[in-house]
C-alpha cells in the first residue's frame, strides 16, 4: 500500500486530520450501528452534558507498521476494557468491547495510508472517546451519548534520542481520595492543567503528584505512571487506588519479569525513599518510557545516578524490548498483537 507523502520523522506530536473516523450514538437505551465518516466536526446541543458537567471519558492507543509490513495494534482489548470501566464510573453506558475493537479495526483500515512506515519511528495514534451528547440542565447523567474514534499520525516521541526529564513535586493534587483518579476521564486532565503550566513556567518538564490523603507517597504525573529501578535492578511501581491503571506499565511489568528475568514489586512508594533508586522513568502510550534524571522537591534535588545523561540501562532494556514487541522484531506474548492489515 502506498503511504502518504509525509516527512514521517518530523511530523511532531500534534493533531493531523486523516480521511475517516468512526461515530456511534446511544439513544433510547441502546447503541446504534455506528459508521465511518469523513466529517471531523462534532455538532451537539448547547446544553449537552459534556459541555455542562464534563461527562466524558477517552482512551489512547497506536497502530504500527511491523517489520513484515503488517499493520497492527497493541493490546486494544485492554483499552476497550478500561474504557468500559471509566464509563461505568461516570454513569455512562459502556461501549461494548467487541464494538470497540471493530471500530479500531475499521478506522485503521480506512486510514491505512496514514500508518507510518516501519523504521520511521512514527505511529498512527488512535483516540477513542465518549461523551454525553444529550441536553442536561440539572446535575444528572445524560440520556444520550456519542462514541467517536479518530486517528492522527504522530512522529517519534524521542527525536534525536531520549533526553532525561526533570520533574517537580506539585503542591496540587491530581485526584481526590475515592475520586476518579483510577479512570481515564477528561476532567482529571483538566484538573492537572494549571499545575502543568505552572511547572513548565518554572522550567520543569512535568509534575510529581503525591497521594491526596497524606501527601507522602508518589502517585503519578499528569499523564504517565512511574517506574523505579533499585540499585540491585529490581523494578518498583507505585500502588494506589487513585492511579490510572496504565496498559504500558502493565506490559512493562510483564516484560521485566518474563523477558528480562527481573524482580518486580508493586507497592506504595514514599517520597522520602526516592533517593534510594538508581533509575526512574515515566511510562505511557505516547513515549513508552521517558527517562527522568531528577525530581525537585521544593528546592531539594533527588537525582537518579544511572539516568542523568541518558536512559538508564534497565530502563533502556525495557524500552527496547517492548517497542520490539510492538514493531514485530521481538516475539510477542499471545494475544498482545492484533493484526489488522
Identify the function of each model-found stretch:
Residues 110, 132-133:
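Intrinsically disordered, low-complexity linker/loop segments enriched in Gly/Pro
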Residues 107-121:
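Charged, gly/pro-rich active-site loop segments
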Residues 1-107, 136-341:
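Helix-start/capping segments and mature chain N-termini
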Residues 117-131:
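Extended, Lys/Arg-enriched charged tracts that mediate electrostatic binding to polyanionic substrates
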